């Protein structure tokens, strides 16, 4: 189980590294869910779950001030929990959508204070001439 957890961590790391490695669309559910399914030995089920979640997230594109739900956490956790429970894509969808929405809220609430602290530190450095 530890090896599976490490593989899931690596998949999540590469999915979240879009700003580091460039846009590769690995964060889309149609790519992530089969990778999670492959780790758990259920590639076919991962493909079906990925297609189901992709249909749900197909319009989740960041345009303007809209921030879409966190597809990465919803896909990975929804798929992993559904495979572990021995259920189908309906469970991955039922778990993935609320998880992605909750993660969006957590990212918004937790990242704003951190950015605020760094903004004040940068303002101080600008005033000091650094």
Give a label for each model feature:
Residues 94-130:
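Helix-loop-helix junctions within the multi-pass membrane cores of secondary transporters/permeases
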Residues 1-73:
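Hydrophobic transmembrane alpha-helices
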Residues 1, 88-92, 130:
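Alpha-helix capping and helix-coil boundary motifs
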Residues 57-101:
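Long, highly hydrophobic alpha-helical transmembrane signal-anchor segments
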Residues 15-19, 41, 82, 86, ...:
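Membrane-water interface at transmembrane helix exits
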